[in-house]
């Protein structure tokens, strides 16, 4: 029999509200609607299907404050992660939202009405406190970056009534709700289930770890990977799920089941581990594996880890009696070539030879080198290689930034010709003036409009890069915020190289044959970069060149050398 849900009752709002679906759907059409973001959709789905039991909605201020301060809901139940619905003052005013208002929650992907929320309260969170207490306070932590840069200024708390399930079109048969997974376990006769959380591909070490955990508890295995929002730069879930499916037959017959979890991770380390344990308990698991640096985001720019390697294990251990799910603490396992076996690192005798492959080394080997079978299975490697083609066939973006008349356009055109001569991929050119004319003709030159212009360039560059093209963009891009946005966006699809064309302003003015700088100096043009609007020097350029001291040919050659050093120009 599956484990009891957290709080004693599975809050399956979809099943609870199904008899009233027609009535609720009709009402939802008449209410003010709030369109949810991708993260809010992930949260709503797990609220409605009971994955976040005992929650029945987005947290009001009483629940939010106590979760931040004490890892508990207002009623005393352990819960470690704030589940909140953020909204701007503009939306609150436009929709006339207040306590007791009923609003429709809508899916941004297809405009379907998913739920009705009855507002308990609207409150301004203390983001500084949330960042410190929940995530540790490091401003580089991805959840804190999201909190400070994306989350709106108010939270809306209230209970949910379910109208429609979210639509999914990928791996539908593997997207078990908690109730469905519990029924599945009962059909199989499973009474002890060890859940394994992952956001990465699984290799032999993971198989060995989970089999050891199951055998030590005389249990079965639930492979429960996250397919919602994970860490930027992670391998896409389509590739990962194919790899999990390929791995499944390597388990002893009947030992393991694969189910997908549409969770939006926060990478919250200790807090996240407690949250993950609650979610797996709600899905019927009796045991949960918490490994080294569970749900941690790695390290900051100084190389400092956000969390200690076993902080997550200690956090879950603290609440184990109240959580009602047994934590299986596992250290890393490593390969012993002399005996052809895996063992936990703390069980390896001193002096015994071990082998391992780091994530960085694996990425290198996926492109061109051999991956031994002791590390991963051939069928898994094949799938990963299909989604990680050699650098020579991948897309990339060269982003040139600098003052007007710094030489960006001449460099970009010459680079385009050079790359076309090399062959192997299509080459797209996004010059500043061309983009302004074709994509951003209605925009002015305020800071907001300039940022919007770069966002549009980044969108186009991202999609072209994803399709395997070489993209050369050459806007002025005077603001660090905009350049960082472009790097982050394109890096989801391929490689991004920022080239600072650091030609001095004096040279740009002196060689300006069109007289644009002179007109700006006379006050005829307002908001002109370098005259009455600043150019923020790039903090992390991949290459710095100077058109006043170098020729176009030498600059293009430097860029080509950067690409060649990264393997983008190797012949196949």
From Swiss-Prot:
It is found in: Cytoplasm. One of its GO terms (molecular function) is adenylylsulfate kinase activity. CDD domains: APSK, ATPS. Keywords: Allosteric enzyme, ATP-binding, Cytoplasm, Nucleotide-binding, Nucleotidyltransferase, Transferase. The record marks 330 as: Induces change in substrate recognition on ATP binding. It catalyses: sulfate + ATP + H(+) = adenosine 5'-phosphosulfate + diphosphate. Residues 394-572 are annotated as: Allosteric regulation domain. Residues 1-169 are annotated as: N-terminal. The record marks 203, 206 as: Transition state stabilizer. SUPFAM superfamilies: Nucleotidylyl transferase (SSF52374), P-loop containing nucleoside triphosphate hydrolases (SSF52540), PUA domain-like (SSF88697). This is Sulfate adenylyltransferase. It comes from Penicillium chrysogenum.
């Amino acid at each position: 029999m599956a484990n009891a849900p957290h709080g004693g009752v599975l809050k399956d709002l979809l099943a609870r509200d199904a008899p009233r679906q027609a009535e609720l759907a009709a009402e939802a059409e008449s209410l003010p609607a709030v369109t949810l973001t991708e993260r809010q959709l992930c949260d709503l789905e797990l609220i409605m299907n009971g994955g976040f039991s005992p929650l029945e909605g987005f947290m009001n201020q009483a629940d939010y404050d106590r979760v931040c301060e004490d890892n508990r809901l207002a009623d005393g139940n352990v819960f470690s992660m704030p589940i909140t619905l953020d909204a701007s003052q503009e939306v609150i005013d436009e929709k006339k939202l207040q306590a007791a208002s009923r609003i429709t929650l809508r899916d941004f992907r297809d405009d379907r009405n998913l739920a009705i929320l009855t507002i308990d309260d609207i409150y301004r969170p203390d983001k500084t406190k949330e960042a410190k207490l929940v995530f540790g306070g490091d401003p580089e932590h991805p959840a804190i970056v999201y909190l400070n840069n994306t989350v709106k200024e108010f939270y809306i708390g209230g209970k949910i009534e379910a109208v429609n399930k979210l639509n999914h079109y990928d791996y539908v048969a593997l997207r078990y709700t908690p109730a469905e997974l519990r029924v599945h376990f009962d059909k199989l006769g499973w009474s002890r289930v060890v859940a394994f959380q992952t956001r990465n591909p699984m290799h032999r070490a993971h198989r060995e770890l989970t089999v050891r955990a199951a055998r030590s508890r005389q249990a079965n295995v639930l492979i429960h990977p996250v397919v919602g929002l994970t860490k930027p730069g992670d391998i896409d879930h389509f590739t990962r799920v194919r790899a999990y499916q390929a791995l499944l037959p390597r388990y002893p017959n009947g030992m393991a089941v694969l189910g997908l979890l549409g969770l939006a991770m926060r990478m919250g380390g200790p807090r996240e581990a407690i949250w993950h344990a609650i979610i797996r308990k709600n899905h019927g698991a009796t045991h949960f594996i918490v490994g080294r640096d569970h749900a941690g985001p790695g390290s900051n720019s100084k190389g400092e880890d956000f969390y200690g390697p076993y902080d997550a294990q200690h956090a879950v251990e603290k609440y184990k009696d109240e959580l009602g799910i047994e934590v299986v603490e596992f250290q890393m396992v490593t390969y012993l070539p002399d005996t052809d076996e895996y063992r936990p690192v703390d069980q390896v005798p001193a002096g015994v030879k071990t082998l391992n492959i780091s994530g960085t080394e694996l990425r290198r080997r996926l492109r061109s080198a051999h991956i031994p079978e002791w590390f991963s299975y051939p069928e898994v490697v094949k799938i990963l290689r299909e989604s990680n083609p050699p650098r020579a066939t991948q897309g990339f973006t060269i982003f040139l930034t600098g003052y007007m008349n710094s030489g960006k356009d001449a460099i970009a055109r010459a680079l385009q010709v050079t790359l076309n001569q090399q062959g192997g991929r299509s080459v797209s050119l996004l010059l500043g003036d061309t983009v302004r004319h074709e994509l951003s003709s209605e925009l002015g030159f305020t800071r907001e409009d300039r940022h919007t212009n770069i966002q549009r360039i980044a969108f186009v560059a991202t999609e072209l890069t994803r399709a395997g093209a070489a993209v050369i963009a050459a806007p002025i891009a005077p603001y660090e915020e905009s350049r960082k946005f472009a790097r982050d966006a394109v890096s989801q699809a391929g490689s991004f190289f920022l080239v600072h064309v650091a030609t001095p302003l004096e040279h740009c003015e002196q060689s300006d044959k069109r007289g644009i700088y002179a007109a700006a100096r006379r006050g005829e043009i307002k908001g002109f970069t370098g005259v009455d609007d600043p150019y923020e020097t790039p903090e992390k350029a991949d290459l710095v060149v100077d058109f006043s001291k170098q020729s176009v040919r030498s600059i293009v050659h430097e860029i080509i050398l950067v690409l060649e050093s990264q393997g983008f120009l190797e012949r196949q």
